[in-house]
Regions:
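Iron-sulfur (Fe-S) cluster-binding modules
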Residues: 1-21, 26, 36, 253, ...
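Ferredoxin-reductase
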Residues: 9-115, 119, 171-173, 184, ...
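FNR/FR-type flavoprotein reductase catalytic core
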Residues: 104-290
Length: 378
């Protein structure tokens, strides 16, 4: 999702704590990227350097109070792992969203010197790297979806000197391209190993293939003309939902195996940031619930309907990890050790993970009379 302390692949998990934890971090820098996008970097104290060690493609979750209500939002890290190893730089990309509660707060409020709660890195949008690999990677990205993809590209090109990377990046116009200069610098630095194609919907370009939107037909055209599907070892997709669906469908139709395709969906948190005010009485039909967190066990009652496993734990005062509450970010992932649950939504867990007992607790309701779930097995 390192060279330091890693036995095996360079992409092996680099994080310290099993369960993500919040720490107050001071903002080092706020840098404009486009008219509606900025990057924010944080100062990492020496004692937290290991805790915030990340894998390319991961994200952090920010937490603050807006109008008296706790609000969380996850943002992808946009620097390479080697950047962090060299100078401790932890930087995220934030794009202003119309009506977006947290993004507008970030634009209007976050300044150098301010402090905000930041969760340790999480996420699984990565592949394991190895200096001996000579792979061909491709990424389809759109808008702010470039944020984790940039970290993946930078890290891969530096740690796998025999691998190549092709990026197909869609935007409305030249002015809307995030990290435009940084991408050009990478293109110049790795002239024989990094290929960059910009696809613009509003600004006309000389080559017709580079005009329009990244729908399935456009993605398929790139695979036919410039990036042969049988040459792709691994593919990454991140951006607006229609673009991601289109790229995924095009890769599948071209014969790229599903296990070679990595997809990162940016989820919008559900409107309610707090815990639902569902009354749980002795008469409420509920299962027996046992939650394991940091080696400690807590027994609760989990109603069969109306409230999720995560919210029952939060209501009991447990510091359970979560971010989007929409079944997208995977921050609330845990493992069912006993019993059976059902999930309302699942946009991120793979089929094999579900078979192994992993669940998104923000989407979980009990099926059996007893459920034991562990956040220590993530």
């Amino acid at each position: 999702m390192p060279p330091e302390g890693a036995a095996g692949p360079l992409g092996a998990a680099r994080r310290g704590p099993t369960t993500p934890q919040f720490h107050p971090l001071r903002i080092r820098d706020v840098r404009p990227e486009t008219a509606d996008a900025v990057t924010v970097s944080f100062e990492i104290p020496p004692e937290l350097r290991d805790a915030y060690r990340f894998t390319q493609g991961q994200f952090v979750t920010l937490k603050t109070h807006i109008d008296g209500e706790e609000t969380r939002r996850s943002y992808s890290i946009c620097v390479g792992t080697t950047d962090y190893d060299r100078d401790g730089e932890l930087r995220i990309g934030i794009k202003r969203v119309r009506g977006g509660r947290f993004s507008n707060f970030a634009f209007d409020t976050l300044k150098p010197g301010h402090t905000i709660d930041v969760m340790t890195p999480d996420g699984r949008f990565f592949t394991h790297l190895n200096a001996e690999h000579g792979k061909q990677y491709v990424a389809f990205s759109g808008g702010s979806g470039i944020t984790p993809v940039l970290a993946i590209i930078k890290t891969t090109l530096e740690l796998e000197p025999r691998s190549t990377f092709t990026l197909i990046y869609g935007n409305r116009s030249v002015d809307a391209i995030m990290f435009a200069e940084e991408l050009e610098d990478l293109k110049n630095r790795y002239m024989n190993r990094f290929v960059l194609y910009h696809v613009l919907s509003d600004d006309l370009q000389d080559v017709e293939l580079f005009n329009g939107v990244l729908d399935q037909a456009k993605c398929a055209a790139f695979l036919d003309a410039l990036v042969p599907a049988d040459s792709i070892d691994e593919a990454f997709i991140c951006g607006p939902a229609p673009m991601m669906d289109a790229a995924e469908a095009a890769l599948k139709a071209a014969g790229v195996p599903q296990e070679k395709v990595h997809v990162e969906r940016f989820g919008t948190p559900l409107p309610q940031a707090g815990v639902p005010a569902v009354e749980i009485t002795d008469a409420t039909p509920a299962a027996d619930l046992e939650i394991v967190l940091d080696g400690k066990k807590r027994k609760l009652r989990l109603p069969y309907e109306g409230v999720s496993l995560l919210d029952v734990g939060l209501r009991a005062g447990l510091a359970l990890p979560y971010a989007c509450k929409g079944g997208v970010c995977c921050t609330c992932r845990a493992k069912v050790l006993e019993g059976e649950v059902r999930m309302e939504r699942n946009y991120t867990l793979e089929e094999r993970e579900v078979k192994d007992g992993f669940v998104l607790t923000c989407q979980c309701h009990p099926v059996s009379d007893k459920v034991v779930v562990s956040y220590d097995e993530r």
